[in-house]
Amino acid sequence: MTEEAVALLRTIPLFRQMGLAELYLLTGIGMEEQVPAGTTLGVENEPVTDLWVILEGRVRITSPATGEGESFLEGPAVWGAAALVEPHTSFGTGVTATECRMLRIPAVDLRELAVRNPRLGVRLYQEFATHIFVRLQRLIEESASRNAGRPTSQAPRPARPAARRRDIPELHSPPADALSLLQRVPVLEHLQPDQLRLLFAIGVERHLAPGTLLGRGGEPLDVLWIILEGEVEIDSPLTRGSSIIAGPESWGTASLVPPHTPNGTAVTVTECRALLLRAEDVRALIEQSPRLGVDLYLALSTNVFRRIRVLTDAAGRPLR
């Protein structure tokens, strides 16, 4: 791989946090190829076996499942990043529109490299999580735009007293069942028991009264809430509706990726037992334990993919 090709990699957002040595590790598991025009790189809703790094050339992407139609990727760019997370299926069909100079990286090898070299892995998955969060935000906004002016299917709810933050005494003795509850939180599903203990150690367990505000949609958020027990209502002006999440669950993962703003406002409905994690403390822990960061951002991205599936299914379109 030439220095010029590595320099092109550094301009791609997915790799922008990586140092030169990490980029050479990445290119070491890939193969540079000249790909003829008209070559199918992957088909929507089918397994993605390779991450294609487009160094030069143009790729046509069709994404009927989300209503995004046809678009083009101009090198330097990547196609096939869905290979990074389960279920490893394509977000659209990619076909080269011109002859392309590409680096083909086997997806299995890339995922294994992220585990073997966790500092590389955490930078890769953090950027990917940011990308997929932006994609989810766009889909939510498009869904809201399509539904503008339509009546909601929800019955009116009685007025609720204004939510406010409450001063809750911190609990310094974690209950014995806390780790077993953490293991059931979807965004923590890839973490091992020792990693969960590290995470618990930097958090503060709280008992929250009904009506406690956890965060407002569209406003900066600097905490991640792990709801161990209880229910939280999420109101989203974009979707013109609300939903209830019940522990063990999480809210506030947006605090871990730019722009650090959640889509909805979260308020406790019942008394809740929760673990408060400050985003800056989580990031500091990831710096000390990058493998934890790989597993956390991997689970976070996987859960965002699931939300995208729900949105596309609700819109009555097949999932790509």
Describe the predicted segments one by one:
Residues 1-320:
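Cytosolic regulatory regions built on CNB/CRP/Popeye-like sensor folds
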